[in-house]
Amino acid sequence: MPKNNEIKFVDAFNLPNPGLRSYFDIVEEGQPEEYRTTFARGKSISQVLQEWSNYLEPLSREWPTLVDFENDLKAKVGPMSIMKPLKHRMEDIDHYYDDILLSSTPVSDSAVKAVIAEMKQIAGIHPRSQQKTVDLMKKSTNSGSPYFTKRRNVVDKTMFCSVDNLLQILNLPREDKNLDIWTWADDPDQSSEWIMAAVLGWRGQEGGPKRNDVKQRVVWMFPFAVNILELQVYQPLIESCQRFNLVPAWVSMEAVDQRITKMFDTKGKNDVVICTDFSKFDQHFNSSMQQAAKSILSKVLDHSYISENWLNGVFPIKYEIPLAYDYGKIRVGKHGMGSGSGGTNADETLAHRALQYECAIKAKQRLNPNSQCLGDDGVLTFPGITVEDVIRSYTAHGQEMNESKQYVSKQDCVYLRRWHHTNYRQNGVCVGVYSTYRALGRLMEQERYYDPEIW
């Protein structure tokens, strides 16, 4: 990764900050310890899973695909806390900047319009006030730049806030009554200006029984102020979708189960259901995908000045924000989806939904409306659907998909890590089954160290 000296660290962070330096020391050095919980103390992971398999294997006669689903996740159970040193993670960071450059075509207007039509019940959303937005936000997480402390410690230093390109303006004396956050009564003695920067973080995910099997996901820790501005739209957007059950996963798992049931009950008997699997969806979330999400949002929001300014000034931040990846080092440039954005899930869900519609439109068919997606996770069907249709359509927009990882079946599907089968029902509903092997793994392993005495 090339060094970039365009942004000085002191312009993005309130220094000195011992906590920030200590944090980046850990990022640079990594974390080699495996943290186990007290559950099944004294037993190896393989021993616990083997003992449990005696209860699961008898199900293979009646529900073979359920046991296949369980065994697939059994192979991935293992440590989650191992963190590689930064020097071994640079390639993962590069993917965010490189993968958006793959050949891509715009998502079709007809597909975007289909999603807009699906969202017509909630059209006219007006951005929420900053005060109400902050009241609903979690305050126990890190505030990111510039203060890098708990959010609750710097609410007063952050509110009210605005942005100007890559500049975040904090502690403004007031928010305009018309929610025009780009106009303020200037008070240089009170307000402060900082270059915005996301902070490199990580999430550990099980990938197998060995220490080097741990999957390390790049996390972009966003500035508190940027999240506030983003959530002025994404909070009411998600709440409106929940009200009309437009995205079942934003409502509840029960809503997902009901929609899956409708999908199986309305699809053709010989039509397959395809559970899509992307390779590095965040990293490949390029300008074509970004524009699809923005186009949909532009029709869901009202036509006010604040909405227009939000689309032009706040929406793009998650794709352009600089990344502080080490102490004193900040990388700039356009990139894929920053995971710590307040709109990550929403943008990806809207764009992914457009891909589902486009796939059916290209096949001259109608997407089964009970198809679903959330972020990069999706399940879809329409008459005559094939996995080749899906891959051909999705990869046209710069996405990478491995054909062998797409799950295809007429009777069952896996969505949001839960297995559903058209014949496995409770009170008529195709309820989802979470992997018991994965659950056992989460009971035994932890991503961070927690003192068992204060759990």
Spans of model-derived segments:
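Short helix/loop capping segments that flank catalytic or ligand/cofactor-binding pockets
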Residues: 216, 229-230, 242, 283-286, ...
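Conserved NTP-donor binding/palm subdomain of two-metal-ion nucleotidyltransferases/polymerases, i.e.
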Residues: 426-455
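Polymerase palm active-site segment centered on the conserved acidic dipeptide of motif C
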Residues: 382-437
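Reverse-transcriptase-like RNA-dependent polymerase core
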Residues: 162, 177-215, 259-269, 310-329
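Non-catalytic, polymerase-adjacent accessory regions of viral genome-replication enzymes
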Residues: 1-207
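Active-site-proximal segment of RNA-dependent polymerases
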Residues: 220-283, 344, 357
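Conserved polymerase palm-domain catalytic core
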Residues: 268-374, 379-385, 393, 412, ...
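Glycine/proline-rich, flexible active-site/cofactor-binding loop segments
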Residues: 205-249, 320-337, 346
